[in-house]
Every structure is written in structure tokens, then in C-alpha cells.
Amino acid sequence: MRIGLIAIDGCFGSAVASVIDIVRVADGARGDVDPRIDPIELAILGPKRRVTTTASMTLTVDHPLSESGEFDVVVVPALGTLTAAATNDALQSRDARSVIASLGRLDDATTRIAAACTGVFAVAETGRMHHRRATTSWFLGPEFLKRYPTVALDLDTMVVVDGNLVTAGAAFAHIDLALSLVRSISPDLAQHVAKLLIIDERPSQAAFVAYEHLRHEDPIVVEFERFVRARLDEPFNVAFVAQSLGTSRRTLERRVRAALNLTPLGFVQRLRIERARHLSATTDLTSAEIALRVGYANAETLRSLLRRERRRS
């Protein structure tokens, strides 16, 4: 397998390094797992001869972007941004536009595209993600949905595979992305690499989501969040909340789904779990007392939800 890793000035340094290291360890270890596994080659693709990452790491580019189609897999790492505004600016840069143009020319039938974090935005800019499943950085989910409403975004899942499109979540999800590429070659090799590098399986990024950082501009969603945060200890009834906010249940459900990719009840459950974890870590309250503080009649109901979250994470 030939893997082309795209790099431009300002790309996330640890993202690039983690992909390089995992792929090269996999290539070095393949003979120990199964001598029939073909070599795994990795090369750097870019718009110029040398690029510098956010970690001030200088990379020598092996191939121009025009040769991207010669690789089996093209990996698009994070742009090195943490906010919607910075991501938008990065996407408008000359280098990013060159990357987007080269991605748009790839044949979906022959070249797999793998992207993580804000790199998924660059792939979405090509228009090739319409009505396809994907994930990206959890904290940029609302902005992604706003820009690309036809993408079926799944912010819970760490790595999403949809045909020849592979996407992963925030920042160090590049590790999971690289390991998924190795797994597509050989599950046994991926398991061996994970053991060598002590990589735990992380199928979900849900456990890392801090919902107070999900900034949404929809005034109904903002008021909904304020309303339920102030009443997490009370029973939740979506029709009652909608009426209290002066809107209909259908409108509230639609607007919350568009902003957060969750149902109103799903969002409330996440907020309750988040609050419960905070209370558990910062107070001496019993499990039963915490359960009451977050709207559950007994501790077992809360424990059941927490166990479910751990399994998903």
C-alpha cells in the first residue's frame, strides 16, 4: 500500500508525526506478523518542497500535490486550528486551496481519502462528502454542520468509514485514523502495532466532549441549553420545554438536531452525565444524592447511563 500524507505550513505537528510513526512501525513489523503482507510505503505530499508544522518541525516534501492520484491512500491531517474562525481562515489560504483542488481531482473509486480533525473540513470543501457519514473535531461540530449540512455527521464515533472515505475526530484521533488504515491491511498487524506502541482502542470521542464548549448561534438552541442547565434536577419533557421557550416541539427538535446533531433528550442526558461526573469529582455527595441533583430518581439509573457511556467510549 502506498500512503501519501499531505502536509502544509501550519498543519498540526503531532498529527503528522503520529501518522508517520504508526505507519512506519507497521511496515517494520509486518514481517513478524505475516510475511505475505506487502510493503507499506509512506511519502509526504505538499504544495512546496519544505513545510513547517505547528511544532516547528520541518518536513521535506517527497511529491507534489499533482501526484496524489498515484497513491492508494491520501491522508489529510489537521490544519492546526482550534476555532471556527481560524479554521475558516486556514481553508482560504493558498496552500489549503491547492490541497482542496487536488483532493477534488482524485478518483473516489481508486483512491481512499483519510482525514482527521479540521482536515475533514478540507475534504468537505471538495463537495465529495454530500450524504456521506463522517466525523470531525467534536468542538467544531456545529460549525461543520453549518457549512456542510448534507453530511451525516457522527460526532460520537472516533473513526467513521464510508466507502473509500475515512474520517476521524479531534487532534490525537490521528492515532486512531492511522491504526484504522493499518487494520484495513491486516487486523493482526494493527493489533500488534497497538501493543508495541501501547495504544488503547477508543471507538468513541463522546467521553471527551465538553458541551459548554459547543458554541451554537441558533437563539432557540441557546435558550434551550440555558433552560435545561438550570433545571437538570427536574423531570424533562420536551413538549413542556418547547412551550416554555415559545416554540413547537417539532421546531425545537429540528433546531437542536441541526446545531448539535443530538435529540433534545440526548443532549439533556449528556449534560446530566457531565454534571454528575463533575459532582463526583468535586464533592463528597453520595451516588444517590448526585442522581437526584441531575434529575434521576435513583443511583442505579445514573450508574446504568454512565456504564453505557463508558462502553461507547
Where are the model-predicted features located?
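Extended, subdomain-level signal for the structured scaffold at the beginning of enzyme domains
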Residues: 1-113, 122-124, 190-191, 200-313
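Predominant activation on well-ordered alpha-helical scaffold segments within soluble catalytic domains
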Residues: 17-20, 24, 145, 175-179
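Short active-site oxyanion
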Residues: 108-113, 128-133, 164
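Acidic/polar active-site rim loop that often engages polyanionic ligands
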Residues: 122-129, 174-175
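A conserved active-site-flanking secondary-structure segment within enzyme catalytic domains
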Residues: 130-157
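Conserved Rossmann-fold dehydrogenase catalytic segment
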Residues: 153-166, 192-212
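Conserved anion/nucleotide-ligand pocket segment
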Residues: 161-196
